[in-house]
Amino acid sequence: MISSAISSIRAQLVDRRIKLQDTVREIKNPANLISLLNEVDSALERMDNGTYGLCEVCHDPIEDYRLQQDPLMKFCLDHLTTKQQKELEQDLKLASKIQNTLLPRNNATVDGWEYFYHYEPAELVSGDYCDVVSTDKNSKKQFFIIGDVSGKGVAASMLMSHLHAMFHSLSSINLDVHDLVERANRLFCESTLSTHYSTLAIVLANKSGEVEICNAGHCAPLLIKKNQIIKVDATGVPIGLFCSSEFGVNKYKLESGDSIFLYTDGLSEAHNHDQEYGENRVMNVAEKIKTFQTKQMISAYTDDLTSFLSGSLKSDDLTMLAIKKL
């Protein structure tokens, strides 16, 4: 775990220690709190002697996301008790169910746009973010959002849920893309650890086909038009890195039949035994699917990826979102 993350956790533990000490003085039977206070002191001591974050059995590093969830963790996954392993499995299954409820409805049309997405976690939970958010009813605009949170596992899935809540709250204010992303960046930066960030690609589309796209350090969205394919490169850094970051926006006009394809690096950085899938292959598939409906577009990519992998396992979350102007 990098030093900035440990410094942030140390600050949390010191604050927790002060609050526990105050509470212990105020209650009559503080035995449980004293035990917790001892655990906090032990964690701070491990930070001082350089053993914090190392499993007390095998001395290998404890998974970062688990330390971020519980800074008092002493054992890696391989050395949890049977009871702890079962509890972890139950927590993961519950987290997966909750995450699935946050996904938008699929294979739908909304205000002149058709969309379809593919959402495939590498494990039970995902750090990918996929959403379709309506602005106020009068404006007839939709936000199509895809993102990839740093890290993996439960910690990343919790940050994905955080993004979901932020954007659903901010969308009700009827902001343009620029202001939306800047506010989201500031909120995300102020409410998470300094090591947390998320790439994002956000499309604001209106009924007439006008779109605004902001790419915050994400894989380049593709505008798939009849005679050309346009890559929308990054117009800013991932959100959460710097609280005062600025983000550029590109504007386009799409005609009926034009599409936008968004994806996470689970596609472009997928590997078989010999090579990476790569952005060039993403572009090559796009050339072949210009006239496809959104569901067919996604199927073309999943089929091509399966063929490319040739039995190799996927190692990262995979999300793809296709949008088409009707």
Predicted feature residues:
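Regulatory cytosolic signal-relay segments
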Residues: 77-128, 220
